[in-house]
Swiss-Prot record:
It comes from Schizosaccharomyces pombe (strain 972 / ATCC 24843). It is a multi-pass membrane protein. This is Protein ERD1 homolog 2. It is found in: Membrane. It comes from the Eukaryota. Residues 212-387 form the EXS domain.
Length: 387
């Protein structure tokens, strides 16, 4: 196996931790913009009730909104919308994203200034790529005497519930479920971060080396990529078992949705490890066809779940859709874009992409498209919840 790294300038200037940081920062900005847009729409463009289109939605049980009281207790519904999107939340998101952007840009400029384009000394200054990570840790862990302290505390508690205990807050679980869903979009970035940890330990001398060369990458990188989906699966199962009478079936199906991603990740790792034993061309091995089948199944399941469950869009099976906020063609365009970007999720796990170092920025582009798709999903999901 060839260990030579092709020295593309863009690869070295935008090193791996900087690419991960860029994904996190863009996602934070888009999350804040999404919440801001939903807040404006809820305030200036209220939705007329449509009981016929919403009575069949099991998702309201998950959100702790009794269907019998949904249209009779307007005060409770208004209070729920107010708690769903608060100005303090997206203002804190803007502040958090701005601080991260400044720390990322500072580390990036210092990194380029120190290395001066010298490939030999490019990876000898790990503190600069990690500056945004240190900043994010401080913003989350250490309390600050600022106006957004409540949002900071809420984010910290949500992270602990989701990532350590695999739970969701029973009083308002939708935020914890959104956190776990967004975390799945960073599965590939989490695997890249493990590679960066190998670099810091001196096991890999270049960020652009393939992950299976050192650090048992054929096992730990797929495990790191699978962790967000494992978190989402356990969270759904825990909440479903705790609320068995109302939400067990829908949470079991949601856990199954996340579980469909695990075979794709596992088969990608196996094919990548055995790619020297067969050629991924016209004469594919049976593992490759299993990967194709699992990728199609996962993409189809998650796409249908996004449209019918998370967005509550019923066309073309219903004459009208539940939402009154936008015309039908807006939701149709959103579904089409979501389907196209769903395919890129599987494409970035394609085992053949790892055979060429020059595809590295292409894989990063796929990761950025997934962040954009998550913004689209979050917008229509919040639109469905607030309606």
């Amino acid at each position: 196996m060839d260990l030579e790294v092709v020295e593309f300038p863009l690869h070295h200037k935008l090193a791996l931790p900087f690419r991960i940081g860029l994904l996190v920062i863009v996602g934070t900005w888009l999350w804040s913009v999404c919440y801001h847009l939903i807040y404006i729409l809820n305030r200036y463009q209220p939705i007329s009730p449509n009981p016929r289109g919403s009575l069949n939605s099991k998702w309201y049980h998950l959100l702790q909104i009794p269907l019998s009281n949904r249209h009779t207790d307007l005060e409770e519904n208004t209070e729920f919308k107010a708690n769903l999107v608060s100005p303090v939340d997206f203002h804190a998101g803007y502040c958090f994203a701005a601080i991260l952007s400044i720390s990322w840009a500072t580390g990036f400029i210092l990194f380029l200034k120190k290395t001066q384009g010298d490939i030999g000394g490019l990876y000898s200054h790990p503190i600069y790529p990690l500056l945004w990570v240190i900043t994010a840790f401080i913003l989350i862990v250490f309390p600050f005497p600022w106006r957004y302290r409540s949002s900071q505390r809420g984010l910290r508690k949500s992270i602990i519930r989701v990532f350590l205990f695999f739970q969701a807050d029973f009083r308002s679980p939708y935020k914890d479920f959104i956190v776990s869903e967004i975390f799945t979009s960073y599965a590939k970035a989490l695997g890249d971060f493990y590679i960066f940890g190998c670099v810091l330990q001196g096991h890999i001398s270049k960020f652009t080396l393939r992950p299976d060369l050192k650090c048992d990458g054929t096992f730990f990188v797929p495990l790191a990529m699978a962790y967000p989906f494992i978190v989402a699966i356990l969270q759904c199962l825990h909440y479903g078992l705790s609320r068995r009478k109302h939400t067990f079936k829908i949470n079991l199906l949601s856990a199954l949705k996340h579980a469909t991603a695990l075979p794709v990740i596992y088969l990608s790792a196996i094919i990548h490890a055995k790619q020297t034993k067969f050629t991924l061309t016209s004469g594919h091995g049976y593992l490759f066809w299993l990967w194709i089948l699992s990728a199609l199944l996962s993409s189809a399941y998650t796409f249908l779940w996004d449209v019918f469950i998370d967005w509550r869009i019923r066309f073309p099976f219903h004459k009208s859709i539940n939402h009154k906020r936008f015309p039908m063609f807006i939701y149709a365009i959103g579904c089409f874009i979501n389907f196209i970007l769903r395919v890129t999720w599987s494409m970035k796990l394609h085992p053949r992409l790892h055979q060429f170092h020059e595809y590295e920025m292409g894989i990063f582009s796929f990761e950025m498209l997934e962040i954009l798709r998550r913004f689209l999903w979050l917008f229509f999901h919040l639109d469905a919840i607030s309606s």
